Amino acid sequence: TVARTVQVSYKIDKNTIIEVTRFTDIDGQNVTLNRSVKEDGTGELVYTKAQKTKKSKLTNQSYDVFLKLATSKSMPQTRGATVGSDVTGSQYKHIFVSNLSYTIDNTAIAQIEIGGVETAASLLITGLHLPGSTAVTVGSFLVSVVLATSPSKVVINQSLYEVHFAYDNSYYTHCYHDILYSYDSGGHLMDTTKSVSYTHLRAHETLMN
């Protein structure tokens, strides 16, 4: 699957966070998403697929989130029986950060049908400010929903939490709860998809229900 191919790296260059996300799209093409985030939340997304490069200006990116991702000592976990429960036990506490809502309209859906996960992830990075691995994972779900239901629009409601170690309140990971609502042209709800993503986990370990 697309999510299993995701590789993400971070570095800090003069207070600018550089995030590089690489993955293989559903059409077999290799994709690179190169995002920069400055302290004021502005930045740029440069995405390359099939030797074609596009650029988008970014605003309202959470510098704090990306700084923690770039400096966190949390290592990606291997999949096991405790994935999911390992960050919901009493040794961790979830701290609410924000709610966001983003609408994928009919024009964007048509672009996703052509561009695949690369287009979906780029839209989510711009609209919901998701970290690369989470954007690719949720983007994969979005592409699946679009191809399966051919919706007129998709509304994504997102809740963001920080997860801290309970014993010393130190940062562990970010937790993204995303719900995708698909509607037909008459405004009728067609499908609901939920995902829970932890930034310390590899994208393919995102939890679905």
What is the role of each PLM region?
Residues T119-F141:
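Short hydrophobic membrane-inserting alpha-helices and related fusion/pore-forming segments
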Residues S140-S152:
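Transmembrane alpha-helical hairpins and terminal membrane-anchor modules
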Residues T1-S98:
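N-terminal propeptides/leader regions of secreted preproproteins
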Residues G186-G187:
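Residue-level signal for glycine
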Residues S195-S197:
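Acidic, proline/serine/threonine- and glycine-rich low-complexity intrinsically disordered segments
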Residues T199-T206:
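Conserved small/polar residues in nucleotide/adenosyl-binding loops
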Residues N209:
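Post-transcriptional modification and biogenesis factors for structured RNAs
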